[in-house]
């Protein structure tokens, strides 16, 4: 018969492993809030898949939708006080709710995100414009850049972001825009045909084509293969920026 001391030390050895197992299983997940002001199922799927593909499964995604912000911007023709205040309030609410980083998806509100950079730095909760790194990459890759959008309110903020990036990089760029009017909400094949038609001439004189809206991302490879030009869409760049922010905070490895 085995001694009591043998049984005691065997149980003690097993028990000593339990705290480490519990810590590993209950490790807090990094919280990533994604802020939308307009959505489609395709848009949400592309953005959230890009974030999950870039990061491990050990994150918690929180989606925030506030369509009134976009509607007010379109109605007023610019980002007025009311939509800007709503946007800021949603960001602060996510901070209070424990978000570690907030990803801003809508291009029409990019100027608000830029204006809030000092506040987000003070809060310690990065507010990431999904277009920021895409625009940086576009400037790296060429000097003749075409911005494509289905909403006119998305074009101006993207242009200003491109201008900032070109200044930071000491590079002169030429930016033109293409508005694919009526393109938002179309089925995939109809939209791809419309994009092919609208971009045939601009593609010839472009080094880089960037899509101003996440809802257009699924069409990027099609246009790239069709015209042999560099085509950038923002979901993967936004996801990489989220990863960099979480790494900087020491929340992931």
Q: What residues fall within each predicted segment?
A:
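Bacterial N-terminal signal peptides
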Residues: 8-19
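Non-catalytic structural scaffold of enzyme domains
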Residues: 20, 24-253
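Bacterial N-terminal signal peptides that target proteins for export
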Residues: 1-8
